């Protein structure tokens, strides 16, 4: 099963992606984690990505697309994957579609985790990430609204909305139900 998770920063995509990947026996592909690892390792891509992430901006699509394309070449993705944090724009969604077309496959499901803005601010301030300052949080929410929300229109009929308020297990149960599992 090939699944895309959508939702604003702090909606719980990463946590739910881990649980879904475990339950479905497929890898979680998190561009955020891949960027953080590259930043920590001081790679050229990591240094370049850090400049954008520190400002609360999205890493340019060409860098992100290459990272995802390379990851999809790994054998553990053959049976499927959970994409967490990608695609973030219609341009990236089209690139993903092309990557999958080259592999004779497609996305099976798109889950949108929905949370109110007040709840998101509370969650993000409580995570303790160095990059989660008020200014960066508000900019990331604006970037999400401006650039990522149009994905809901792009994926249209494939999108299943998941209410992301509640316990981890409650949200997980809703996500599984949305996937028909």
Swiss-Prot record:
Annotated signal sequence range: none
Assigned keywords, A-Z: ATP-binding, Cytoplasm, Kinase, Nucleotide biosynthesis, Nucleotide-binding, Transferase
Annotated compartments: Cytoplasm
Chain coiled-coil ranges: none
GO molecular function: adenylate kinase activity; ATP binding
Enzyme nomenclature, EC number: 2.7.4.3
Region named LID: 126-132
Family stated for the protein in its record: Belongs to the adenylate kinase family.
Purpose: Catalyzes the reversible transfer of the terminal phosphate group between ATP and AMP. Plays an important role in cellular energy homeostasis and in adenine nucleotide metabolism.
The protein's assembly and partners: Monomer.
UniProt protein name: Adenylate kinase
Organism expressing this protein natively: Mycobacterium marinum (strain ATCC BAA-535 / M)
Gene name linked to the record: adk
